[in-house]
Amino acid sequence: MKKMSDQLKARLELRLSNAAQPHRNRKREMKRPGKGNRNNWKKEY
């Protein structure tokens, strides 16, 4: 169980750190391809 708790701890630290990305609604971005990164919507298809 210690290994699992280490994973959870690392995940929590990542969430608190600057490396964590804010939540983005990808479905909404697919409907509005012009917003945000211009080439990002092409990857979704």
UniProtKB/Swiss-Prot annotation:
Region (Disordered), start-end ranges: 1-45
Highest taxon listed in the record's lineage: Viruses
Segments of skewed composition (Basic residues): 23-35
Compositionally skewed regions (Basic and acidic residues) per UniProt: 1-14
Protein's recorded name: Gene 78 protein
Native source organism of the sequence: Mycobacterium phage L5
Lineage of the organism: Viruses, Duplodnaviria, Heunggongvirae, Uroviricota, Caudoviricetes
Gene: 78
